[in-house]
Design a protein with these regions (language model features):
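Low-complexity, S/T/G/P-rich flexible repeat/linker segments used as non-globular hinges
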Residues: 105-107, 111-163
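Generic alpha-helix signal with a bias toward terminal, lower-confidence helices
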Residues: 13, 46, 86, 144-150
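Alpha-helical assembly-interface signal, strongest on the long, hydrophobic N-terminal helix that forms
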Residues: 1-68
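Short amphipathic secondary-structure patches
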Residues: 40-128
Length: 163
């Protein structure tokens, strides 16, 4: 009887361990998807500049268009609704991400190089060109019954590269 109990315990332990490893691997995959989506979205957004401002070599962001572009690219890469950022059916996410900070530094409000510091989000960067700073909070889904979803904050700094 004791060997049956031991075998049963080992089977339960193996399934529990497998579930924990699966959850950790899925969290890693989702985190990399978030990072890649943030890079793509910010790269797209920093290209939205006022066309006439590039003629003199001092580009100025069209902030409204850049914000819309950021949201659209982020949504397309993460399975979210582009206007509300709410998760679409079959999305990895169950909670809409929140853009908690979005700042634009260009020739209208800074000279370069510009030293940007935001202690709240751990950003300390020297901006050599017009740049966008965006911070988004994501609720990471859980794939294990005993692991609660948790929130991560992802900061991103992206500079205008020109055309």
């Amino acid at each position: 009887m004791k060997w049956i109990m031991m075998a049963l315990l080992l089977v339960v332990l193996q399934f529990w361990t497998h579930e924990q490893v699966l959850n950790l691997e899925m969290e890693t995959v989702v985190y990399h998807r978030i990072e890649n989506a943030m890079v793509l979205a910010s790269q797209d957004a920093v290209e939205d500049v006022v066309p006439s401002s590039t003629a003199n070599g001092q580009p100025i962001f069209n902030q409204t268009e850049a914000d819309q572009t950021f949201r659209a690219t982020l949504a397309n890469n993460l399975g979210l609704d582009p206007s509300t950022l709410q998760p679409l059916p079959n999305s990895t996410f169950h909670v809409a991400p929140q853009i908690v900070d979005e700042e634009f530094y260009d020739w209208s409000n800074a000279t370069f190089p510009y030293h940007y510091v935001n202690g709240t989000y751990g950003i300390n960067e020297t901006l050599d060109a017009p740049s966008m700073v965006v911070v988004v909070q994501f609720t990471m889904p859980s794939y294990a019954a005993n692991v609660q979803p948790f929130t991560i904050t992802v900061p991103m700094v992206q500079s205008y590269a020109g055309s």
